[in-house]
């Protein structure tokens, strides 16, 4: 089963604008108005706190300009910043196997293979 995925390089974009774009695209992809898309982006320094985040793990930063966002994902705290390429896949998982463990493992293998080549 092969699916085409749009790859969109957003360049540098702040986290909030990228998050808003993901939410808008998610609706369009689920309704079939847009095809599956992978957004690639570089953020200014930002920390995101997943649903399992322990705020004690967030060390005080040297700069008060670093923003912190609570986000709708699992995990703890993640840092994004300059020089780091971040990928956000917006996919209709109904078109794939409906097993999230399969999806995460497949995504991991694709990234490993891509970086190895």
Predicted regions and their residues:
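N-terminal lobe of the biotin/lipoate ligase/transferase fold
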Residues: 1-117
